[in-house]
């Protein structure tokens, strides 16, 4: 193990456990507050180490790197607080043993988002800085909703920063805002279930759980623990927003009619503040349920009466779904969630709808690469779990040749069966768990073929597709068996699609 340190201090230490993006941000923030640090990582040369060492050259920091499969027994000596990286699985070695020791010693374990929440509380006291905070979590769609919400807020005339799981880390964004003297009026936070596990005092003005499907069970242990981690963000929120199509998110609130609850879904909204979709005369619309123009004053509540609930209202059509540049029903639902978050700030519809119309989406998320011979090639490499792929297949509205496979993370692939049967012309399988997906899909009768690499996958898919179809890369799996990460997988797919176009004489 590699151990180095700068000047020692006798004060209790903060242990930064894991030097990913959030660990680096937490280390910078704690050093900025004058805390002596001990930084530990299983890797000898974690990414960003040199930059961190340069940034903390004048701070009191002890580095414990290259810990490997076991953290040293004295790692907790003198430690008052552990800042745990979301990349470390708490029930696996060596993290499990260290956290057990921390509990025995009454050492507090927090995450970077908890430090961010405490930082905002401190700034409220020292600078009277009280921004609005919006929080987004869910299995799929978090980044799209976070990025879109920020744009809608800025279109409405308020300054906003997006941070958290979307990158940059929340504390890195806060440090930057402080250094530039440019603190925003609104923070829009994308929060993963990992981050929520170690967050206790964040109290958003509004929070949304977009959906909950199987993912990260290797980290949480089971589906119940995963859903509970997502639900943590709703209880302290002033306004809770849920997907009424998803029973797991609906169960996170006491009642969909509650005054502090809003919902979105595929159906027409019935309660004031809710949003949904309406199909009228062959056109799908984004809709909102708004108060009637001449509502009577609410009657005085009698003693022991049940709590007041939201009333019904009138439906307003906002814009046709086809006017969105982002593709698929799942992205229409993402747009509804983003608008509800922005509306919680009392922003008007006009600027939001103009921005929504122009929003082109985030990379590797149902992203149109190009069309070749009347076949659309769509990069949904961020579809790293079954739920994301189901949403992509259901949302596109056309027959699909699906490219799927990779590292399955122990998921149940059976939810793919009905949507593949309905929407897929064929499936091209890649990666270590491609064969496992193929076996699950056998009852569909949909042709499944294997490909050794992305080049072969794209060309096999092109052969199977018919005019009007889409070739969809939505793997339902992690990428690390064949690629550096999901962006790399998407980039390779896009490059192979462009090569295919050149081979077929299509340049534009």
Swiss-Prot record:
Q: In which pathway does it act?
A: Cell wall biogenesis; peptidoglycan biosynthesis
Catalysed reactions listed for this entry: UDP-N-acetyl-alpha-D-muramoyl-L-alanine + D-glutamate + ATP = UDP-N-acetyl-alpha-D-muramoyl-L-alanyl-D-glutamate + ADP + phosphate + H(+)
Chain residue ranges for the region called Disordered: 294-314
For this UniProt record, give its keywords in alphabetical order, as a comma-separated list. Answer: ATP-binding, Cell cycle, Cell division, Cell shape, Cell wall biogenesis/degradation, Cytoplasm, Ligase, Nucleotide-binding, Peptidoglycan synthesis
Q: Does the keyword Ligase apply?
A: yes
Q: What is its main location?
A: cytoplasm
Q: Where is the protein situated, by its record's location annotation?
A: Cytoplasm
Cellular component (GO) terms are: cytoplasm
Binding sites annotated in the UniProt record for ATP = 138-144
What Enzyme Commission number(s) appear in the record?
6.3.2.9
GO MF, one term, reads:
tetrahydrofolylpolyglutamate synthase activity
**Alphabetically, which GO biological process terms does the record hold?**
cell division; cell wall organization; peptidoglycan biosynthetic process; regulation of cell shape
Coiled coil spans: none
A Pfam family reported for this protein in Swiss-Prot or TrEMBL: Mur_ligase_M
Q: Which family does it belong to?
A: Belongs to the MurCDEF family.
What's the stated role of this polypeptide? Cell wall formation. Catalyzes the addition of glutamate to the nucleotide precursor UDP-N-acetylmuramoyl-L-alanine (UMA).
Annotated protein name in UniProt:
UDP-N-acetylmuramoylalanine--D-glutamate ligase
Its taxonomic path starts at: Bacteria, Pseudomonadati, Pseudomonadota, Betaproteobacteria, Burkholderiales
């Amino acid at each position: 193990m590699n151990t180095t340190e700068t000047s020692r201090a006798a004060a209790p230490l903060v242990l930064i456990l894991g030097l990913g993006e959030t660990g680096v941000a937490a280390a910078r923030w704690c050093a900025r507050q004058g805390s002596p640090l001990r930084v530990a990582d299983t890797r000898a040369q974690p990414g960003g180490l040199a930059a961190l060492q340069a940034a903390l050259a004048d701070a009191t920091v002890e580095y414990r790197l290259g810990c490997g499969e076991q953290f040293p027994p004295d790692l907790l000596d003198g430690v008052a607080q552990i800042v745990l990286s979301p990349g470390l699985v708490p029930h696996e070695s060596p993290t499990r043993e260290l956290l057990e020791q921390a509990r025995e010693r009454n050492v507090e374990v927090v995450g970077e988002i908890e430090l961010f929440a405490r930082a905002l509380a401190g700034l409220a006291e020292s600078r009277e800085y009280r921004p609005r905070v919006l929080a987004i979590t869910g299995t799929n769609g978090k980044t799209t909703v976070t990025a879109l919400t920020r744009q809608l807020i800025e279109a409405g005339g308020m300054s906003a920063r997006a941070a958290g799981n979307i990158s940059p880390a929340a504390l890195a964004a806060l440090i930057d805002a402080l250094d530039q003297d440019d603190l925003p009026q609104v923070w829009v936070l994308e929060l993963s279930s990992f981050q929520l596990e170690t967050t206790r005092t964040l109290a958003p003005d509004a929070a949304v759980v977009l959906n909950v499907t199987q993912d990260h069970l290797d980290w949480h242990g089971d589906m119940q623990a995963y859903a509970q981690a997502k639900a943590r963000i709703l209880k302290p929120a002033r306004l809770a927003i849920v997907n009424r199509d998803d029973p797991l998110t609906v169960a996170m609130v006491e009642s969909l009619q509650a005054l502090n609850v809003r919902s979105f879904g595929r159906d027409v909204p019935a309660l004031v503040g809710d949003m949904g979709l309406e199909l009228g005369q062959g056109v799908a619309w984004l809709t909102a349920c708004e108060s009637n123009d001449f509502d009577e004053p609410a009657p005085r509540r009698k003693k022991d009466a049940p709590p007041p609930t939201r009333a019904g209202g009138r439906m307003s059509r906002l814009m046709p779904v086809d006017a969105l540049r982002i593709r698929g029903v799942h992205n229409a639902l993402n747009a509804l969630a983003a608008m509800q978050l922005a509306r919680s700030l009392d922003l008007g519809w006009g600027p939001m709808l103009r921005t929504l119309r122009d929003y082109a989406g985030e990379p590797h998320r149902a992203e149109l690469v190009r069309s070749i011979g009347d076949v659309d090639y769509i990069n949904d490499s961020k579809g790293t779990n079954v739920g994301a792929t189901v949403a992509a297949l259901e949302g596109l509205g056309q027959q699909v040749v699906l490219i799927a496979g990779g590292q399955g993370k122990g998921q149940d692939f059976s939810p793919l069966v009905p949507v593949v049967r309905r929407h897929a012309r064929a499936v091209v399988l890649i990666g270590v768990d491609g064969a496992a997906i193929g076996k699950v899909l056998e009852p569909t009768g949909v042709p499944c073929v294997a490909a050794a690499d992305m080049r072969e996958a794209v060309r096999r898919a092109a052969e199977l597709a018919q005019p009007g179809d889409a070739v969809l890369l939505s793997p339902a799996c992690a990428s690390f068996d064949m690629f550096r990460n999901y962006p790399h997988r998407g980039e390779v797919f896009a490059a192979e699609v462009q090569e295919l176009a050149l081979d077929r004489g299509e340049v534009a």
